Amino acid sequence: MWGFIVTCGIFLVLLCQLRLLSKRKSKSTPYNALLPNVTVFAMGGTIAGCANSSLEIVNYIPGSVGIEKLIEAVPAIKAIANINGVQVTNMGSENLTPADVLKLAKLILAEVAKPNVHGIVITHGTDSLEETAMFLDLTISTAKPIVVVGAMRPSTAIGADGPMNLLNAVAVASSNQSMGRGTLVLLNDRIGSAFYTTKTNGNTLDTFKSYEAGSLGIVLNQKPFYFFSPAVPTGKVFFDIYNIKQLPRVDILYGYQGLNPKLAESAVHLGAKGLVLAAMGATSWTDDGNEVISSLIREHNIPVVYSHRTAEGYSSNSCLGIPSYFLNPQKARYMLMLAISSGYSIRDIEDLFSIK
């Protein structure tokens, strides 16, 4: 008898707790018809990372916090937009694959097609953030704002930058001033074009820069201020990924003194359908390396794009293959992958990368 009473008591307590939780949830995420709707796709990374100490900013586990907790940590967001959080993956961005990025792009395409969705935010690890951002910039043709955001400090750190970055990203995605600007990268109050923005430092907060192209704007008190009217980067094109099920393998080879020229052959034999060379200087490659590249182009009709290992620079058309011009190796790689997927010939790819 007493056991039955105790069981009933426990049941009632749990029922009350569930009701309280449901009430709290409904209060914490109210819908405001006057606010824009923003969908946040979560991919993991440092912004969702946790460490054992609030002083630890190096040794932590990325992708430890779910999208719900990330949103809850920034209550001011609900005054800016109605948020719909979607967990796509939850890992360090070094482990993301082209398949993951293709999946994300298709999810975003479906989301921006909804008339009630104003903008998109993607939380992402910073290690490969620029690659995902570039892919989205080349495949999502919409005027709606798409903002990729990350953090350099885990969520557990003193002075964690993730919450403010996320708040600013939602503010940018909610603003009509962000319309028609392509995919944007937002960290440390700066707004950059995905086409040009790159990570320049492995540790500091002010790591994402656009070098010669410059920032598009800044965020002050959750309001974006743009320096220019919306414009399309020179050389930017859109690829239709609706029928693409799998992206071809494209490898990046790094130039250095005494490089092994056979590495290019190995990459092709292991399945690479294209190569991007992070060449020395303005597309310098070793003589014996160029002999191998020439043979691969002749025998396999494989596209080879010459980029540069320098932080800035212009890859000229003096190289043996296709110059990437201002695109760094990692950005050129995704453009080449999409071109191959779309059936581009080598001549088409040359025209794609050229700056008229």
From Swiss-Prot:
The active site is at 46 (o-isoaspartyl threonine intermediate). GO terms for molecular function: asparaginase activity. Its main location: secreted. It catalyses: L-asparagine + H2O = L-aspartate + NH4(+). Residues 36-356 form the Asparaginase/glutaminase domain. Gene3D superfamilies: 3.40.50.40, L-asparaginase, N-terminal domain (3.40.50.1170). It is found in: Secreted, Cell wall. One of its GO terms (biological process) is asparagine catabolic process. Substrate binds at residues 93, 126-127. Its EC number is 3.5.1.1. Pfam families: Asparaginase (PF00710), Asparaginase_C (PF17763). GO terms for cellular component: cell surface; extracellular region; periplasmic space. Keywords: Cell wall, Glycoprotein, Hydrolase, Secreted, Signal. Glycans are attached at residues 37, 52, 176. Residues 1-22 form the signal peptide. Belongs to the asparaginase 1 family. This is Probable L-asparaginase 2.
